[in-house]
Structure formats: structure tokens, C-alpha cells
Amino acid sequence: MLLRLLLAWVAAVPALGQVPWTPEPRAACGPSSCYALFPRRRTFLEAWRACRELGGNLATPRTPEEAQRVDSLVGVGPANGLLWIGLQRQARQCQPQRPLRGFIWTTGDQDTAFTNWAQPATEGPCPAQRCAALEASGEHRWLEGSCTLAVDGYLCQFGFEGACPALPLEVGQAGPAVYTTPFNLVSSEFEWLPFGSVAAVQCQAGRGASLLCVKQPSGGVGWSQTGPLCPGTGCGPDNGGCEHECVEEVDGAVSCRCSEGFRLAADGHSCEDPCAQAPCEQQCEPGGPQGYSCHCRLGFRPAEDDPHRCVDTDECQIAGVCQQMCVNYVGGFECYCSEGHELEADGISCSPAGAMGAQASQDLRDELLDDGEEGEDEEEPWEDFDGTWTEEQGILWLAPTHPPDFGLPYRPNFPQDGEPQRLHLEPTWPPPLSAPRGPYHSSVVSATRPMVISATRPTLPSAHKTSVISATRPPLSPVHPPAMAPATPPAVFSEHQIPKIKANYPDLPFGHKPGITSATHPARSPPYQPPIISTNYPQVFPPHQAPMSPDTHTITYLPPVPPHLDPGDTTSKAHQHPLLPDAPGIRTQAPQLSVSALQPPLPTNSRSSVHETPVPAANQPPAFPSSPLPPQRPTNQTSSISPTHSYSRAPLVPREGVPSPKSVPQLPSVPSTAAPTALAESGLAGQSQRDDRWLLVALLVPTCVFLVVLLALGIVYCTRCGSHAPNKRITDCYRWVTHAGNKSSTEPMPPRGSLTGVQTCRTSV
């Protein structure tokens, strides 16, 4: 038990000549530098930052004298205590043969005249960064370890241009002077005070003195005032003639002193600013041999060749400055994190990106996008909408058809002279959502029987109807046709003029009625009804509409064409003979029908034969000259014409040899009730065949291209892989040599370097 108490007491007693370990910071200064001990647990990086904030750096004891000063400062610390010093080594930078073993000082160099390693150098790959720490007890040797571990404290070093000695104790002084260093360490146990330190002296008389370690005009560094520091009163009411402060001497004399940042002028009373004309690049402080000293801001250090200039310090060379990535720039550095990590608030550490941060970023991005879209909507003007429907396009594979054109003289309601002609080229598909119309009506021109003109059915008052020349189906009878008036037939020979007979037929089915019949129903007063041309005959308007009974039927017969005359002669002679005297009318010219001119009349049965019966003159309505009416545009109905007509539309220009529109009478539309013919069906078949050609072309073009490519590949193959030498058998390439020694002199000698008696040839396997 006694032995244990003795050992505990020995461990508690400090070693001889060494300062005991205290938890308070302390410092030891020399003529050119100061070392300060801060017993606070820090990592290497944190310790380096703490020293930089105070204007210094981690301790770099390069000489034995500096090492001895460090030993006296550390004294006796804990048995296992460690203190960081300014030595570090980067990964894979081992140099065991050098004094510092690959370590460098935090100042960036490897110059040293002193080392104190605790362990010998070893050969190794040095895969990680290492930092050096000083033992707090014993011989204060250097140990290397991980830079991220926190140790018991750290040592800082502060360099200055000069230092002032400690003030001696004077008579009348209340106690030792208290010094405040530039690195904010307050103590009264300094032997040397760095440049810029302040000494506070307390006198017994109640007054004190404050001194500043500054540069002297003669050179060097000294205190701003010399003793005695505790004089009697003698400044008087005018402050002793001093500009700033007046100090009374012991013998009653007074001395002047300047405030911080100023120095006493040569007259001893006024004060001047030493940094007003100092050539410092960044910061200037009064003091020093020249009255001022230049300092650099954080991130810079004084240049070695010129103390007035400042150069950048590469902080990224210090191990552990940043947790992941470090970027150095002039005057500082910045830490970055790899993908998936984010920088913490301290600006050094990195942590994995959390879900809350990612969600906040996404919300911010969505908010910015929403704001951008709202801005675009506000800037985009609204388009004006007139409230009308847009006409849809028809089916793309159905080509729009146009009503036939029979030339300029046969168009109704010609424009006046000088009025420009306009082409009405519009598609014929019906607009969407259109109102229901009446039954479909079409006029059919048959190519197998003579043309019959009937004017007993006028055009219905609809803007969507047009006369259609169709060869596909017979006309449909209207539901409520308007009242109709007969028209005068074209002029023929007098010997063939047979009067018409008006007869009343009962209502019969379509198949039991006479060959060509048009029914007349009670008249009604429709709106304006422009006539529509359905054949090549001029249109003639009757002067009035004669009322007829509801059951009245009008049958119109045309005389047969004489055998000795062709249809062309009949129509041509009709231009020269006037109408009968009992049938008043207008002398007109009927142009040839393209159907009768190109297709001869075919024999028909008795039902389809044409007969005429004389009709009294009183029953024939007189014709009257036509009056021009505004043209009506045909829409929403297709027109199918026979193959003898051209599909192209004639231009609306006057032609020579054609009467003026004003002098040509017009006839009402003549709807034909002839049945479909083979010629019309062949026209539709030709149109369908024309549509099928595109499919054939679409199939043939790729096929031809493919055949051309195959032909080209075959030609290339034949030219590249031509005929080769015939293959030989294996017995033709080798032969047995039985008498190698009896080889005749006539046998050719094999070439030098080749196998004797072996023939080479190319064989195929």
C-alpha cells in the first residue's frame, strides 16, 4: 500500500526544471518567433485552422534552439499526451532516406536542421496520409499517425520581424507588467514580446502606463516609452503639450505618447501615421524598425524575397483540409463533394444527400417550371375565333370530281362584257354536320339512244345541287318536284316535224311507264331557281309557268333520224330551218352533241323508239329570249360523264365562231332517264384502272431496285472471285524419294533453302 502511494506521488510531482502541465494556454517567445501551446483536443486539420485564425501556423521546430524552447514550453504533460506539430506526408510519398522521411512542413518546404523521430524509418508503400505529433512527456519525440484522429492539443508558431524584451520591475510599480500578444494570449511570464504586443504597467500611485512594442526610427524593435513608468503629476492643463497622451515622469518631467496605430514624431509631441506612406500590399500595422510592419490576409503569406508583397498559400496541400475534394484559388480554397453527397454547413465535411434535400430540390424545380409556364401563357396572345366550323377535308384517296363544262356559250347567266372570268374550282365533298337534303337527282346522257330533251322538271332551289351527267344509275324521281314547263325541241327538217301529243297517264310504277316520261305536279312558288345545263343544247326560258293539273303527264317524242343522214348532218341542218309556223320560238343554233357525234345510234326496241304526234300550236308554250342570271356554284354533288367527254375543264374564255352570250337563248335543264350503258361503265372501269396503276407502280419500283442491287452484287462477286488454278491432289504435291543417293545429274537441283524432292502446290480442303 505504501509503495502505491509513493508511486502516485512521484508521478504527480513535475520533473526538475520542467513546467507542470496546465489546462490553460501558454506561450514562449524568442527574438524572432513565439510558440504557443493550446491544450484542446483537435484533429490535425482543426488545429491548423485554429493557428491560421490567430495569424500563425502549426509549430515547425527546425533547429535545436527552437526545439529546446518547445520542450520548455511543453514541460511535463500526460504520459500518453500528444500535440500536433506542422509535419504531414501525402500518400505514396515515402522517402525513408531523407531526414523528414517524405514529410513536409505546413509552410511547404522540407528544410530542417533537427529531427526527433521516435521510431526508425521503415520501407513501405505509404498508402495513406500521415501527420506528425509531439509527445507531451518524456523526450518529446515525434510520432506519425492518422491525420483524422483528435489528440490532446497542438502547438502554434508565430513569426515576427522583431521582439521587445520584458519590462523590468521599477520602483513605484504595483506589480509585474501584464502583456497581451497579437495572438490574444495574455500573460506576465514572457521573456520576449513579439512585435505588436502591449504591456500594461500598474503604478502604486493609482495611475498606470501602457506601452507598445514598435519599431524604432533608428532600427530594431522597442517599447514606445522608456522608464520610469510611474512618474508624478506634471502634465498640467494643456496635456503637457502632447498631441495624444501625456505621461508624467518620476522626476516630474512629462513625455508624450501616441495612440495605437500612430507613432511619435521627431518633435516628441505630435503623432504621425506610419502606414500612410508604407509600401505594404495588403495590411499595414505600426511598429517595427521602420515604424510599420506589413501583414497578409488569411490565405496569403509574405513573400520570401520581399516582405511587402503577399503570395497565395496552397491550402489544398495540407492533409484533411477537405473531406473529399479541394480546389485552391488565389486567397483561399473551396471544398467539394462527389456525386451523391452534399457539403455540410461547415464547408468542409460531406454527407450523403438526404431524401428531404432531394425532395426540396424537386419541389423548387417544379415551382420554377410552373412559373415559367405561367409567364409563357401570359405572353402568348389569344387567337381570335370567329365561331364558324372549318370544312373538313374529304377522303384522301378519293380524287375530287368537278361538274362537266360544255364550253363558254352554254354556261348560264354569262357575265357582262369586260367582267373578269373566274374559275370555280372547289372540292365536291359535303361539309360535316350538314342538314339533310332531298333525294339525289342526276341527269344521264345515254350513248345508246337519241338525246331527249325535257324541260318538265326545273332545278330544285338548293345551293348544293348541280346537273350531273352520269352513266351509273337512272335518275330518281323527286319527292315533291315543283311545277314544270315544257320547252321547245331543237329545229329539224320540216318533213320530220311531227306535232307533240299531250296525254294523261295514270300513276304507274317506274317499270310500266312509257320510255321517257316526266311527271308534272302542282306548281309552287320556289325562290330564285337558276337553270342548270345538262346537255349541249342552249337553254331557253319560258315566259311564264302554265298551271297544270296534278295528274297531267307530258310525253315528249323526238323524230327518228333518217337513214341517209348522220346525226351530225341532222344537227347541222337544224341550224338553217326555222321552227314551224304554229310553234312560235326563237331561231337558235344547237351545237353538235358530243354523244351523237362520236357514238352512232344503236337499234332499240319498240318501247325505246321515238315517235312524235302533231300537237296544236296552242298547246306549245312560246319560247322567249333568255335573261342573264347570276351563276350558281355547284357544290356537294359529283358528276360522272361518259368516256366520250373530256375530264379537263374548258377555260372560261370566249371562243371564235360562237355567238355572244346575249344573243344565244338558253334551254332548261334536261334530265335524262336513260339506263346505264356499257360505255359509261367502261369509263368508270377505266377510272378504277387508273387508280390501280399507282398500287402497281408502288410494287414494281422496290422490286426493280432490289433486282438491280442483286445484279450489282453478282457482278462484283464474279469479278472478285474469278477462275483460279485447278486444284491438285495430294499425290501430285508429294512423291516418295527412294534413291536419294542415286539421283541423276539431269534432275534439277532444288532451290537453296527448300526441302529436297518436295513439290509445293496449292490444295483445297
Swiss-Prot record:
Residues 18-695 are extracellular. Induction: By wounds. InterPro entries: C-type_lectin-like, C-type_lectin-like/link_sf, C-type_lectin_domain, CTDL_fold, EGF-like_Ca-bd_dom, EGF-like_dom, EGF_Ca-bd_CS, Growth_fac_rcpt_cys_sf. GO terms for biological process: anatomical structure regression; endothelial cell apoptotic process; fibroblast migration; fibroblast proliferation; lymph node development; positive regulation of endothelial cell apoptotic process; positive regulation of fibroblast proliferation. One of its GO terms (molecular function) is calcium ion binding. Residues 717-765 are cytoplasmic. Residues 162-232 form the Sushi domain. The modification Phosphoserine is found at S754. The keyword Chloroplast does not apply. One of its GO terms (cellular component) is cytoplasm. PROSITE patterns: C_TYPE_LECTIN_2, EGF_2, EGF_CA. Disulfide bonds join C131-C147, C164-C213, C203-C230, C316-C326, C322-C335, C337-C350. O-glycosylated by sialylated oligosaccharides. Keywords: Calcium, Disulfide bond, EGF-like domain, Glycoprotein, Lectin, Membrane, Phosphoprotein, Signal, Transmembrane, Transmembrane helix. Residues 312-351 form the EGF-like domain. This is Endosialin. The lineage of its organism: Eukaryota, Metazoa, Chordata, Craniata, Vertebrata.
